[in-house]
Amino acid sequence: AVCVSLLGAANIPPHPLNLINFMEMIRYTIPCEKTWGEYADYGCYCGAGGSGRPIDALDRCCYVHDNCYGDAANIRDCNPKTQSYSYKLTKRTIICYGAAGTCARVVCDCDRTAALCFGDSEYIEGHKNIDTARFCQ
């Protein structure tokens, strides 16, 4: 099933192209009843920052994604949060384009891996908006 929701799209503030690409990848891989925003403050690592031990498989996806962005940032002139890239959503998978090892390809691969991981991991409602000071040390 394909999920499309344009309701309220006119009120969405502009984001860096990379974030838009990542959101599109996430929407492509997660269950239809979820929105990409439900993953923005989940566990210890999904969202801004992160600390402690990931609390479940989904949170581990975000932990790995954070580390992947950290590795990408070591590429000369690479800012993973703003880097644009080319990709294709097809046959329930995601294909990244570009030369291996380039900033664009590495960042795309980080986002691709995370989005596919989200699709394969259970979303536990009780792990949304957790008390990070208590559970993420």
Curated annotation (Swiss-Prot):
| Gene3D superfamilies cross-referenced by the UniProt entry | Phospholipase A2 domain (1.20.90.10)
Q: Which residue positions are annotated as catalytic? A: 65, 111
Give the enzyme's main class according to its UniProt record, as a single word. Answer: hydrolase
Q: Which residues form the propeptide?
A: 10-17
Entry note: cofactor: Binds 1 Ca(2+) ion.
Where Ca(2+) binds, per the record, is at 45, 47, 49, 66
Q: What is its EC number?
A: 3.1.1.4
Disulfide bonds listed in the record? 44-136, 46-62, 61-117, 68-110, 78-103, 96-108
Q: What is this protein called?
A: Acidic phospholipase A2 beta-bungarotoxin A chain
